[in-house]
Structures are given as structure tokens and as C-alpha cells.
């Protein structure tokens, strides 16, 4: 059974971010696997103003077609931002910069470890994972057995 977080809860998170306050959320869903494990890992999100430089490969909290989500910023096209989940194989969301409410600053893993989301080594790993998207369908099941 798929568990859906009420959009009103995430709307409140967006409001807090817009007010300049960071938020911490327990992530659900598998679209950011293997870097974020749904139902196990928490993330801290810091506000984003919609106009400042957005680092490539950063994970962001945004609204797309009325749904709030956290996905990876993978590029731009015609002044819009391209987002893709680490666990997604094909779908890329195209959003206005003003639809981004926050940037992930820290991932709190269930084993007690933390990950600084601005760490350069981390972002290089993320970039290589993005480049492997043609074989993700084979890697993800293997990683789920190892990591989950």
C-alpha cells in the first residue's frame, strides 16, 4: 500500500520556508533512493529565495503540478529548472525557479549518520549517479537489497 503524505502538511512546510524558517521532514517515497531512503531518513531543508544561484545536483523542495516533492536539480531549459528523482528512470519535472521553496542542507540517516548535502564529494557522487540513469533499472534493485 502506498502511503501519501497529505499535501496540506507539505504546504505548511512550504509556508515556513517562505517565511525564512528551516524545516525537518521524514521522507516517504522512493524517488530519491539510494541517497534518501523513504520512511527511514529525515532531511533538513533551508529556505531558497527563487533568485539566488542554485547549485547543480542539489536536492530541492518544490511544487510541481500542485504536488510538493523533493528531487534533484539537474539543469535548466528556457529559463526553467529541470528536476529528477534519484530513483526515477525517465520523468523530469520542469518548474519555474519561483516554485522552489528550499534546498536540502542535511540528510539524517536512520543509522545516526548525517550527510552534508553541499559537500563537493557528495555532489560528485550524485552527478555520477545521474549519468548512470540508463542502467539504474538494474542497479536500484541490487542497492535495495544491500542498503535497505
Which residues does each predicted region cover?
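Extended hydrophobic leader/signal-anchor segments used for secretion and membrane insertion
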Residues: 1-148
Amino acid at each position: 500500500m502506498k502511503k501519501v503524505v497529505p499535501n496540506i502538511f507539505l504546504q505548511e512546510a512550504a509556508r515556513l520556508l517562505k517565511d525564512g524558517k528551516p524545516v525537518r521532514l521524514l521522507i516517504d517515497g522512493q524517488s530519491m533512493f539510494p541517497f534518501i531512503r523513504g520512511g527511514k531518513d529525515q532531511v533538513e531543508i533551508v529556505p531558497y529565495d527563487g533568485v539566488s544561484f542554485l547549485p547543480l545536483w542539489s536536492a530541492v523542495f518544490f511544487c510541481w503540478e500542485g504536488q510538493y516533492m523533493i528531487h534533484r536539480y539537474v539543469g535548466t531549459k528556457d529559463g526553467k529548472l529541470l528536476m529528477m528523482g534519484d530513483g526515477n528512470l525517465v520523468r523530469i519535472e520542469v518548474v519555474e525557479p519561483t516554485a522552489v521553496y528550499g534546498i536540502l542542507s542535511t540528510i539524517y540517516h536512520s543509522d545516526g549518520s548525517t550527510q552534508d548535502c553541499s559537500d563537493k564529494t557528495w555532489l560528485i557522487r550524485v552527478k555520477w549517479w545521474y549519468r548512470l540513469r540508463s542502467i539504474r533499472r538494474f542497479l536500484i534493485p541490487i542497492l535495495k537489497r544491500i542498503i535497505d
